[in-house]
UniProtKB/Swiss-Prot annotation:
Sorted UniProt keywords: Differentiation, Repeat, Spermatogenesis, TPR repeat
Official protein name in the record: Tetratricopeptide repeat protein 21A
Subunit field text: Interacts with IFT20. Interacts with IFT52. Interacts with IFT140. Interacts with CEP78; regulating IFT20 stability and localization.
Origin species: Mus musculus
Annotated SUPFAM superfamilies: TPR-like (SSF48452)
Membrane-crossing segments per the record: none
GO biological-process terms attached to the record: flagellated sperm motility; spermatid development
Family annotation (PROSITE patterns): TPR, TPR_REGION
Repeat region (TPR), residues: 110-143, 214-247, 326-359, 494-527, 529-561, 565-598, 616-649, 721-754, 755-788, 790-821, 831-863, 883-916, 918-950, 951-984, 986-1018, 1022-1055, 1195-1228, 1230-1262, 1264-1297
Lineage of producing organism: Eukaryota, Metazoa, Chordata, Craniata, Vertebrata
Length: 1314
């Protein structure tokens, strides 16, 4: 054999060490075709034959090479091993071989020692192998082959300190050479040390040097898997199969990938079939390897029934090949018990115990079967015996789990059971420490066993979702922690996903639970339990229509859903919630007749049955339905039946707590409290009972002392962080944050790494306005616990306190900490920090906002690429977050008036979340803003059909219809919304504006009356008063308007708008055109002194209002500055006007195309007699497209420009602007007044009178100047009676109005006299 043909020898050694005996045999035969007399190859062939259990053939082969000096030593050692494996041992031959071994060893060459060491290593005798290789290295003066072998021997040791030394020998063995086996050793070493880049570099060297050396590609595949790079893993697996279509490792990894990542049953089954075929053809006589390679599939097959059958069938064939192997029988028992096939499991465990009576795993499995069959006494007795054995053998997670089962089912000891479950989990995960992702990792992870533990925990968890503000049960947190690593690496496994969804549901994370269930249903649309849980989530959200839809959807996918009692139970709960108590009672009474299953674990029988916990829920729901239906006597009877039925069971306390609710509904508070007092600290539900008692003391008895006393008792009897948190929260509830702080602080000292405690302490300090202490606490706690979410809470607090630089520093430090290799949670946290940072920058570094949001979106895109592979249940939520970032970017572009970029961002948001109605609404609103009405309508129409978006869609469509001048449709849309919610003041406000703009403001009072009917408190509501104030302002009653707006001025929602309008009314009570001079010559000077005094009083009042105005938003600050300078403008004093103008110019420069600032500039220029400059600004505004938000200021700007044109005699240009005003506001009395003025100037008195009539109508006859002009034009048009009538109307309200009596009334009356 050629000395440089290291690739063939490396393959043989690799396969020998991996126990691929047939591969060894084939590779040796290939070598022997070229080197027929090579003793080393003959030895390896013999080793392969021996491994396949053809012992006599192996002995013959080994005896043939026993005389060769290179293989004599290894042949003798192998012969000894072979003889000892025989059913009948030839003692004489063994003795002869042992004496021969001593003699040969003394004179063995380095080569002989090398092969002997190899064989001992293959057989797992590490110490002996090391002894031989050390001897060989002495004899050979440091052979490189010897160093490589010594490196491998140490590398595969079970002792970590020995493994670490292996690299030294591997380095020595590969120095100045590309020894394939040595390089493989180095790559494997780096992999064990999780230096994946180093391992990949070495593996690439091997594949470059020997492209056909498959073990190197297999190693690369395993390396990519260890790095959790599934794409590269699968690609490498496919490459291996191109070279070797029956490669066992490749098919195993591809099968694992399909089971844990894709979840496609058909493909998974195909890949498992291919793995079994590869094992049966590639290694036909190797049952140990078969078992080793199929075990991971056995652990992962989950709900895939086809895969389960393939695995169980293959394991049975392995058992038939080795009928004396108790391990295979035990594994079959374990496979069946995990799939709740207890009968089959029992048979196999019995078989295992026949073969090996003291096999711990088989005994434990047998006890598990007894527990599931309800044989608790016998199981407990057996466990006592095994606990003694366990002490000598070390802890077994299965035995600890079984102890927990017995504690829960036989002795009803919740605390002991949960403590044992926790211990089982700790023992389980301790065996996985340091393991990289690999088939071995998945095998040890054993997801279905963890699901069994999780389900046991759930028996002690609340049965209903957590209410807002209530603490999450620590047990639910424990279950989430158990399942988290499973769901992370195996997101396509149904059972862990489903139980995770249950945990999220019970924790009150309803949307997260929905996302997880959605993933379950994508994997298997026929999964009954997932449909039922999804409908329960909708029920908890109050979405009864979707609850029913979900149930029917489940039926459409799987008719067996209807046979499930839970289907009818959920339906009954939905009926109860919607008030159909009679139908709910009928349904519940029907399912009460369904028999109860004995075990909680699950049902495999065909006939429907309910678990005890489900039956308890059904009875309690029936009690509730009867109570709500007024059948209290029947409710009490059913409750008593439930108490009798569940006495002494885990459901007893739950029934007791429900009985308390029934007693309370009857008003029997004392009975309720007595029942709760009967629950002792040793019983489950003790915490819930104390919480219920506390609630009664607080809300019914109004006794704060006894309320707190309940939580103090809880802390005394069940001390721990959870009880302390409840006591602290109780103090917070009664507004005693100082005492809450003491409790939180004491609990924190005992648990300095509990971030939830830090969060509460921080919130308590904020509540007591001790902001500096809160900041210090967050900063100190962050250093101790290193919890990133605390840094976000701290940054939010600093932002609230306007400490922008400090908030920026905190967030930047957190982002620097998170740099480097990131997992998904740290990336998610980084996105949160970036979004907070963008919020900070909005307040003090606007130029940085866009870049920060883009960074967040870029990072979120990377998360979305990784989530499908690692945590697929998070996809919907992460898509929503990406959409919200796009919307924030769009809003930023919108503020900058960059509409094209804004549109792109909103479309990007929709790409991330196509069905998110909020995103669709935002896009529709942008289309409306851009005047793309058809596209807006297209987006809004479907949203009208959905209840949760109907209101906003209707409001938007109403705006759209108004722009199309379809006023009736617009008003009807608002009307529909207000009929459902008359006290929706945001919509009422929009309707008042729409009625005004469509010329129907007289219809508004009817809607005010409708709102008042909802509640007697409506007239006190700030929103209602605001709407009334605006109404009175528009009908020309400024004093009434101020009275109502003042009632809304202090409100957080309506205050800013109310103050702005009040200031404008004070500065301009007659709603004149500021700067307009066309009508000034018509106004007499007789009252100029009193008019000036009135103006000054208005300015003083406006300034006083602004001194009490404290806006929190940036837009509010801008509004305040604008109003302060409008006060200066209203004085009409040149110095003040110039100061105001300077401010307006600054504002217009700061905010591109700011319409309020440009209008104010124009008004200031006119007051300063700089009309051309004013006209320039107003012409800019004339080109701006109309929007609802800017409507008022645009109308004022068009009227002011029309005034300038009127003064210059450019009536055509003025009329064009006035018609535009009327297009958007049919009630614009000023536009009609200017049109009347123009007609009057053209001596068209009839047309002038027509326009003044409309101006008089829409000013609600409140402006005497318009009345004067109308009467004058009636006089000119010889309509004397009409003129007299208008004069009387004016004089009734304004008896001293100048000139009207002499110049019009008397002349008209004189003209009527004959």
């Amino acid at each position: 054999m050629s000395s440089d043909d290291s690739s063939l020898m490396a393959s043989i050694i690799y396969y020998s060490q991996e126990k691929y005996f047939h591969h060894v045999l084939q590779a040796a035969n290939v070598g022997l075709e070229r080197y027929s007399s090579d003793p080393a190859l003959q030895f390896f062939r013999a080793y392969g034959i021996l491994g396949e259990d053809h012992i006599h053939d192996a002995i013959s082969e080994l005896e043939g090479i026993q005389s060769h000096p290179d293989t004599s030593l290894c042949a003798v050692i192998a012969l000894l091993s072979a003889h000892k494996s025989c059913d009948t041992i030839d003692i004489e031959a063994v003795q002869e071989l042992e004496s021969s071994l001593k003699e040969i060893r003394r004179s063995a060459s380095s080569t002989a020692l090398y092969y002997a060491s190899l064989f001992l290593w293959f057989m797992g005798h590490h110490d002996k192998a090391r002894e031989y290789v050390d001897h060989m290295l002495k004899v050979s003066s440091g052979s490189k082959e010897g160093y490589v072998l010594k490196g491998w021997v140490d590398l595969t040791s079970s002792k970590p300190h020995v493994v670490k030394k292996s690299i030294k020998y591997l380095e020595q063995g590969t120095q100045d050479t590309k020894d394939v086996l040595g390089l493989m050793g180095k790559a494997t070493y780096f992999m064990t040390q999780q230096n994946f880049s180093g391992a990949l570099e070495v593996a690439n060297q091997v594949t470059l040097a020997c492209s056909n050396f498959l073990p190197a590609l297999v190693l690369k595949m395993k390396l990519f898997l260890a790095r959790q790079d599934w794409d590269q893993t699968i690609e490498t697996g496919q490459r291996i199969l191109e070279k070797d279509e029956n490669n066992i490792d490749a098919w195993q990894i591809l099968a694992v990938h399909e089971l844990v990542k894709e979840g496609n049953t058909d493909r998974a089954a195909d890949r498992v079939r291919n793995l079994i075929k590869a094992l049966e053809t590639g290694e036909p006589h190797n049952p140990n390897l078969h078992l080793k390679k199929i075990l991971v599939i056995s652990r992962l097959c989950g709900r895939h029934q086809v895969v389960h059958r393939l695995v169980s069938g293959f394991l049975e064939r392995i058992f038939m090949a080795t009928p004396s192997c108790a391990l295979v029988a035990t594994e079959l028992g374990y496979l069946f018990i995990l799939h709740q096939q207890v009968k089959e499991a029992c048979l196999w465990y019995k078989e295992a115990m026949k073969l090996e009576e003291n096999r711990l795993a088989a005994l434990a499995g047998s006890i598990w079967c007894q527990i599931l069959q309800g044989q608790l006494e016998e199981a407990a007795h057996q466990l006592e015996f095994l606990k003694e054995v366990q002490q000598s053998l070390g802890k077994s997670e299965l035995l600890v789990f079984l102890q927990a089962l017995v504690a829960a089912k036989k002795q009803r000891l919740e605390q002991e059971a949960t403590a044992l479950l926790k211990e089982a989990v700790e023992v389980h995960f301790s065996s996985m420490q340091g393991l990289a992702l690999s088939p071995e990792y998945f095998e040890k992870l054993d997801p279905l066993f963890l699901v069994c533990i999780a389900k046991e925990y759930l028996h002690f968890c609340p049965k209903q979702p957590r209410s807002p503000g209530q603490l999450v049960s620590p047990l639910l947190k424990q279950v989430a922690m158990i399942l988290s690593p499973v769901v992370k690496v195996a997101p396509a496994m149904m059972e862990p996903l489903y139980v995770t969804a249950q945990v999220k549901f019970l924790s009150g994370e309803l949307e997260n639970a929905q996302s997880t269930l959605q993933r379950c249903l994508e994997l298997d649309p026929t999964f009954v339990d997932a449909h039922l849980l999804m409908s329960q989530i909708y029920l908890a959200q109050g979405n009864f229509a979707m609850c029913s839809h979900c149930l029917e959807l489940g039926v459409s996918h799987n008719f067996q859903v209807r046979d499930h009692p839970l289907y009818h139970f959920i339906k009954a709960r939905a009926l109860n919630k919607t008030g159909d108590y009679a139908e709910a009672i009928k349904t519940l009474k029907m399912i009460i007749k369904v028999p109860t299953s004995k075990a909680e674990e699950g049902r495999k029988s065909q006939s429907p049955s309910v678990r005890p916990s489900e039956r308890a829920s059904i009875l309690l729901e029936l009690v509730e339905a009867l109570r709500l239906n007024g059948e209290l006597h029947e409710a009490t009877k059913i409750m008593q039946d439930a108490i009798n039925e569940f006495s002494g069971t885990p459901e007893e306390m739950r029934i007791t707590v429900a009985n308390v609710d029934l007693a309370l509904s009857k008003g029997n508070v004392d009975l309720a409290l007595n029942m709760l007092r009967g629950i002792t600290p040793k019983q489950p539900c003790y915490t819930e009972a104390k919480e219920k008692m506390a609630s009664i003391y607080l809300h019914t008895r109004k006794d704060v002392r006894l309320y707190i006393g309940c939580y103090v008792e809880l802390c005394e009897h069940l001390p721990g962080p959870h009880s302390s948190l409840l006591l602290g929260d109780a103090f917070m509830n009664i507004q005693e944050p100082e005492k809450a702080l003491e409790v939180y602080d004491e609990a924190y000292r005992k648990n300095p790494h509990d971030a939830s405690l830090v969060s509460r302490i921080g919130q308590a300090y904020v509540k007591t306005h001790q902001y500096a202490k809160a900041i210090n606490y967050y900063e100190a706690a962050q250093k101790i616990s290193g919890q990133d979410f605390l840094c976000c809470e701290l940054a939010e607090l600093l932002l609230k306190l306007k400490k922008y630089h400090k908030a920026e520093k905190v967030l930047k430090q957190a982002l620097e900490r998170d740099s480097g290799v990131k997992d998904i949670p740290s990336m998610i946290n980084e996105v949160k920090c970036l979004l907070l940072l963008a919020k900070v920058y909005k307040s003090h570094k606007k130029e940085e906002v866009m870049e920060t949001l883009n960074l967040a979106l870029d990072l979120q895109s990377r998360i979305l690429k990784r989530v499908p592979l690692e945590q697929s249940e998070m996809i919907p939520f992460q898509n929503q977050l990406a959409a919200s970032i796009c919307i924030q970017i769009g809003e930023h572009h919108l503020a900058e008036k960059d509409y094209d970029s804004a549109l792109k961002s909103y479309k990007d948001a929709l790409a991330y979340s196509p069905t998110d109605s909020k995103v669709v609404l935002e896009l529709a609103h942008l289309y409306l803003l851009l005047g793309q009405l058809d596209l807006c309508e297209q987006r809004c129409a479907p949203l009208l059909e959905m209840e949760q978006t109907h209101e906003r869609a209707a409001v938007m469509l109403a705006d759209l219809m108004f722009r199309r001048q379809n006023y009736e449709t617009a008003i009807n849309l608002y009307h529909q919304v207000l009929e459902k919610a008359p006290d929706n003041f945001l919509v009422l406000n929009k309707l008042v504006d729409l009625l005004r703009r469509s010329g129907k403001l007289e219809e508004a009072p009817a809607f005010f009356e409708l709102a008042k009917k909802v509640s007697s408190r409506v007239p006190l509501e700030p929103g209602f008063n605001y709407c009334q104030g605006i109404y009175f302002w528009h009908i020309g009653q400024p004093n009434e308007a101020l009275r109502f707006l003042n009632k809304a001025r202090k409100d957080s929602t309506w205050g800013q708008l109310a103050t702005c309008y009040m200031v404008q009314i004070c500065l301009n009570p007659d709603n004149e055109i500021v700067g307009g001079e066309a009508f000034e010559s018509l106004v007499g000077d007789s009252n100029s002194a009193s008019r000036k005094e009135s103006q000054q009083h208005g300015v003083r009042t406006a300034e006083k209002l602004l001194r009490e105005f404290y806006p929190h938003s940036e837009s509010g600050q801008t509004q305040l500055r604008l109003l302060q300078n409008l006060c200066l403008l209203a004085t009409r004093e040149k110095a003040n006007v110039e100061v105001a103008l300077g401010a307006f110019i600054e504002m217009a420069q700061a905010e591109k195309d700011s319409i309020p600032a440009l209008l104010a500039m124009a008004q200031a220029y006119i007051l300063l007699k700089q009309v051309p400059k004013a006209r320039t600004q107003l012409k800019r505004l004339a080109k701006v497209p109309w929007t609802v938000d800017e409507a008022e200021d645009l109308e004022k700007s068009w009227l002011l420009l029309a005034d300038i044109y009127c003064q210059g005699g450019k009536f055509d240009l003025a009329l064009e602007l006035l018609r535009r005003c009327l297009q958007y506001n049919k009630s614009c009395c000023r536009a009609y007044e200017y049109m009347g003025f123009i007609m009057e100037k053209e001596q068209s008195y009839k047309d002038a009178a027509t326009n003044y009539e409309l101006a008089w109508k829409y000013s609600h006859q409140a402006n005497p100047a318009i009345g004067f002009k109308l009467a004058f034009n009636y006089l000119k048009d010889k309509k004397f009676v009409d003129a007299i009538e208008v004069c009387h109307s004016v004089l009734t309200e304004h008896p001293k109005y100048p000139k009207i009596r002499e110049e019009i009334l008397e002349k008209a009356q004189g003209s009527l006299r004959p």
